[in-house]
Each structure stands twice: as structure tokens, then as C-alpha cells.
């Protein structure tokens, strides 16, 4: 289950969905690629079987930094793709689990080590911390979406309560758009070439979705 759908920018009611599905005995993996720093995410309260999310998108950590949270009763069934010294250790289960994932091959752990510092630093930039940052970003995303919708005389594709720091806008077309041309979407190219603004363009039948990402900077 997505926290926020990347192609559409829709904020899913993932908290309710996790509860409803797990009540039926089904394990849930929450895809929080656009979760940390974008929407409130309490992994203990959510209590999903598995949660994974990126930190380089909204928390501003180095690329390649993410987290994987596995509920304690599910940890014995999960192993890293590359085994290390932890595989043969005789530690207690929780310590063995952590050691197995701590050091796999020659991967540089620096991006992960930046996560707590980034959370503290970015959160200190405004008086209200992360709660204020996320709400400010959300309001700016709605403001930007409404400006574009007014200019295009089009209706917002989603209600405000399904908006986070991301919001998509439909750009109408008379053609049946199946895929973006190899040389790129014309509006995407113009925004980048002339203004150095990079905008994701998602193809849908009869229109393109372009979405606004608004962060603290």
C-alpha cells in the first residue's frame, strides 16, 4: 500500500487500509517512498508487517538512504540478499537480525548515518518542527495546483484531503497519449531548458499528469 502514489501524488488513507486488511489476517507492506517528511508516519502505531521508505526525498538526506521496518513477529522470515558475519552469529534473535543487515558487502553506510542528523537539522528550521513543515508544504502544493488549474480552466483531479506535499494537475490533450516521446514531453522540456525546473510527466489516456512537489526550500 502506498502512503502517497508517485504517479498521481494522491495521499492514500493507508492508516485505515492497513488496519482493515490486517484484521483479515493479511500481511501488509507499506510503500512509504514518499512517506518520511511528507506525511505523518508512526511505524509503531501503524503496526504494519513491513514498512519501507526513502529519506532522500523529503528529509533531504543523501541519495540512497532509506529504511526498512519489519514488525518483530515477522523478522525471522526475512534475510538480506547478501549474507555477512551476522548469518552465523549466536546472538539473541533481535541482535542477530540487526547484525545480519548492518554490514552487507562493501556498501558505504554514510547516507544512513546522516538520517538522524537530517531529521534534527531540517526539523529545527521552523518553530513548529516537522508538523509545521509538512502542513506548510501541503498548503503550498494546494496553492500551486489551484493556480495552474485556474490558468488551464480545469478541475483539480483530487480533493484537498488527499493532498500531501505533492499535487498533480491534468494537462488535457486531444490525442490518445500512450507514452512520452523519446525526446521528452514538450512542456517538460521547455520548463527544464528555459527555467531549469524539472517536472515529472505521467502519461494517461487523453491527458498527461504533471505534479508539483513542494519542500521547505
Predicted regions and their residues:
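Active-site phosphate-binding strand-loop segment of PLP-dependent enzymes
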Residues: 1-33, 37, 58
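A short glycine-threonine-serine/GTX helix/turn-capping micro-motif
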Residues: 95-110
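Conserved PLP-dependent catalytic core of the aminotransferase class-I/II
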Residues: 111, 115-157
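Conserved PLP-binding catalytic core of the aspartate aminotransferase-like
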Residues: 135-142, 149-194
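PLP-dependent enzyme catalytic core of the Aspartate aminotransferase-like
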Residues: 180-182, 189-217
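Active-site PLP attachment segment
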Residues: 46-91
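Structural detector of well-ordered beta-strand residues that form the stable sheet scaffold
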Residues: 29-31, 52, 79, 157, ...
